[in-house]
């Protein structure tokens, strides 16, 4: 991991969660209906299919204006690389702008272009779908989770038209040609260096624990098979290794929001296609260096979370399928292996003996 302290041209490509006994799981759900508007432009209609009003955080979900992963795209059964951003968000003190409330049967629409976050210039048929879990919110804190799923939509992409859509990579290239940023120094540099040391320690401990398996392991990863233990341990060892060096490695880590993707409640983000990680302001002002509370957020596990997104650390990089204890522990075994917060929460649980 290359720690950017001072940062040159931009061309290089607490909150405590509720305890398990306090968290509620909704039996309701959200149904997502995907349809094609024009070529790679997609419309999603999200409907509350339950019998009660729900309030949820729509970050990393439909309605989020950032270039996040709203759908998975497949060509010949192989997933097309996602080139947008993945981030970790705070789970308490949430601002109104990141919350959506839906009465029973109510819905909202979101339109987005899948060519903005994936290279579809080769054209041809692709299939898209979406499923996962969004955080339920009560009094501006995550208190549960809500599942969602979509139909499967197959479209025929005009590659020439798709190539005209400006991608996240093209936006980064423009920034690199015109922008310089100030150095990363002082308290932020110190905080990030501490977070990296702590992340390395947490990941190393968690890797050792994962190799042995046990009840805490199966709580998060649903299986105690040797293949699951080995996969989790290998990723965590890779994170520990990446966190241990500030002069080498596969990722570039900025201590400020050099690309402008931080928004309300975002702690840090990763551009996995470029193995770039950046912290947001509230990473430093909102999070403790290392929490003493089970399943709470801190700087160390946020950094660990982001490292799991980067395929340069361990391939393939993880997605954000469920935030927080409740959502993460509702995932299937295969989903948990691909969920960033599962690793962060497990590392926290091992460290604190939760």
UniProtKB/Swiss-Prot annotation:
Zn(2+) binds at residues 305, 309, 320. The keyword Protease applies. Residues 1-19 form the signal peptide. CDD domains: M35_deuterolysin_like. The keyword Zinc applies. Binds 1 zinc ion per subunit. It comes from the Eukaryota. GO terms for molecular function: metal ion binding; metalloendopeptidase activity. It comes from Emericella nidulans (strain FGSC A4 / ATCC 38163 / CBS 112.46 / NRRL 194 / M139). This is Neutral protease 2 homolog AN7962.
């Amino acid at each position: 991991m290359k720690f950017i302290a001072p940062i040159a041209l931009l061309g290089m490509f607490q909150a405590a969660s509720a305890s398990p006994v306090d968290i509620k799981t909704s039996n309701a759900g959200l149904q997502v209906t995907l349809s094609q508007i024009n070529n790679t432009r997609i419309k999603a209609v999200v409907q509350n299919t339950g019998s009660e009003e729900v309030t949820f955080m729509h970050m990393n979900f439909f309605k989020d204006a950032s270039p996040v992963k709203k759908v998975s795209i497949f060509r010949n059964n192989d997933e097309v690389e996602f080139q947008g951003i993945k981030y970790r968000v705070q789970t308490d003190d949430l601002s109104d702008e990141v919350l959506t409330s839906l009465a029973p049967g109510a819905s909202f629409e979101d339109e987005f272009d899948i060519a903005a976050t994936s290279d579809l210039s080769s054209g041809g048929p692709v299939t898209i779908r979406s499923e996962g879990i969004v955080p339920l919110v009560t009094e501006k804190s995550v208190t549960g989770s809500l599942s969602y799923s979509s139909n499967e939509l197959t479209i025929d992409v005009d590659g020439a038209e798709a190539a005209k859509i400006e991608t996240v990579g093209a936006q980064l290239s423009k920034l690199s040609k015109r922008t310089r940023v100030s150095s990363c120094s002082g308290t932020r540099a110190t905080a990030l260096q501490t977070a990296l040391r702590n992340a390395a320690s947490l990941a190393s401990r968690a890797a050792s624990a994962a190799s042995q398996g046990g009840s805490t392991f199966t709580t998060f990863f649903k299986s105690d098979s040797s293949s699951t233990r080995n996969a989790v341990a290998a990723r965590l060892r890779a994170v520990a290794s990446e966190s241990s060096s500030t002069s080498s490695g596969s990722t570039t880590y900025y201590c400020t929001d050099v690309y402008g993707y931080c928004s309300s409640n975002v702690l840090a983000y990763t551009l996995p296609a470029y193995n770039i990680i950046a912290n947001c302001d509230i990473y430093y002002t909102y999070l403790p260096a290392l929490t003493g509370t089970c399943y709470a957020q801190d700087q160390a596990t946020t950094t660990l979370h982001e490292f799991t997104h980067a395929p340069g650390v361990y391939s393939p990089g993880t997605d954000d399928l469920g935030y927080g204890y409740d959502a993460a522990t509702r995932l299937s075994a295969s989903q948990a292996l691909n969920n960033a917060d599962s690793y962060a929460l497990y590392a926290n649980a091992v460290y604190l003996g939760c």
